[in-house]
Amino acid sequence: MSKFDMIIGYNAVKKELKQIADTLRNREYYEKLGVSAPRGLLLHGEPGVGKSLMAAAIIEASGRKAFVCRKDQPNGDFVKHIKETFDKAMEEAPSIVLLDDMDKFANGDEEHPDAEEYVTVQSCIDEAKHKEVFVLATVNNMRCLPKSLYRVGRFDRLIKIREPEGNDALEIIRHYLKNKQVAEDIDVGIIARIMDGRSCAELETVVNTAGLFAGYARSECITMEHLLEACLRNVFDAPPTTNDSDDMISHANLTNPNNEGTQIVYHEAGHAVVSEVLRPGSVTLAYVYKRLNNRGGFVEYYDDQTYTPLYRDLSRIACALGGIAANEWKFGVTDIGGGRDLDNAFSEMKDLVINRGICGLHLYSYGYRDANSQNLRAEQEQATAKEIEKIYRKVKEILSLNAEFLEKLADALSRKKLLSAADVQKIKSECKIVPVAL
């Protein structure tokens, strides 16, 4: 198996990397066309997305000898090591120099991008320019580098490696589950949606943690419950559902408006209902918990890119208000736990008013306008509050028209504490859903 075969997903990126490797291995075909191979490639992105494996795949496919340079020496010795690495590469050209985690060559400080190490790298790249030395670098934080280092001529290609999303996340999770004992009813698609946008390393850790849970429970296979528990533990840093000895959320208290656990349940159910009405299929996880000194819950959403950006923004604001509205609609009480939701809703709406001009261009703030004008700020804040009130009324309408869905979801949350997307969709299928337009 080649190293390119070991890269799961990322088909568009792999295609581009293979093309670059081909220019290095078969340069005579390109020379006949009068074109030259790129001099350098920089792969950048968050840690754990597979940059090092991709770099290794290019080296293998190119057929060239590689000289690796990574920060594993004191500063003075390391500068010397950089020069020696390029000297060896030029002696054995055609070759590749791999600058692994190049943003760590200096102090990793964004305030000091002109460190001696980077100056040395620039000088060495320029010296090797006509010596058939291809420079390959991996970087986590581009802001640590001087812009002159990654300009065209030094690195002709810059490729951002993003966290896996959609089918990429699905393929990677399937790969990590492939050689493990798993239950037949595992829905990999649900886990992929929960983990959408997380690094490959996080996906691998969740699958392995699920296996550890299964082993400790002496289970014959990894179940959906184990995977969901692993998501709670590794992704959301939430308390587990398995230890219920001090669980203070009870289905028996579901009609008691003064019970804090009940308010938590309806709060999270409100978020979920609003999201499912406005963006069907968007809820990936709903969780509630209340222990002696630890309480809360959350609803995780899948950001469906098929909706317009403005609709996604407005629906996020509506979802944020759903928890507060649910307790007001159900019990007529103010939800004291909704402060963060209100902050998020007002912050997003203020951005739409000030930076997107949704309430008129007279409220738009631009570079040379006096954004600190008291009158302008007062108008912007008034417009923001007015729009929030308008959406809040819509949210209460959604909950009122879909009361059956809200009640059944709250009932299920109070019993199970953790609901997957499949659980939510099953409950939803049993209810009459009334669409409401924002």
For every predicted segment, state its role.
Residues M1, M6-A12, E46, M54-A56, ...:
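Non-catalytic accessory segments flanking P-loop/AAA+ NTPase cores
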Residues S2-A192:
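Walker A/P-loop NTP-binding motif of AAA+ ATPase domains
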Residues L17, L42, I59, F155, ...:
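Residue-level signature of catalytic and energy-coupling elements of molecular machines
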Residues R25-L33, K131-E132, P240-T242, V277-A286, ...:
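Active-site phosphate-binding and catalytic loops of NTP-dependent enzymes
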Residues E46, I249-Y266, A272-L438:
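Soluble catalytic regions of large protease machineries
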Residues F105-N107, V182-R198, T209, M224-H226, ...:
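Short conserved motifs of the RecA-like P-loop NTPase core
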Residues A106-G108, P146, C231, V273, ...:
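Activation segment
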Residues R193-P240, N259, A272-T284, V353-C359, ...:
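AAA+ ATPase "lid" subdomain C-terminal helix
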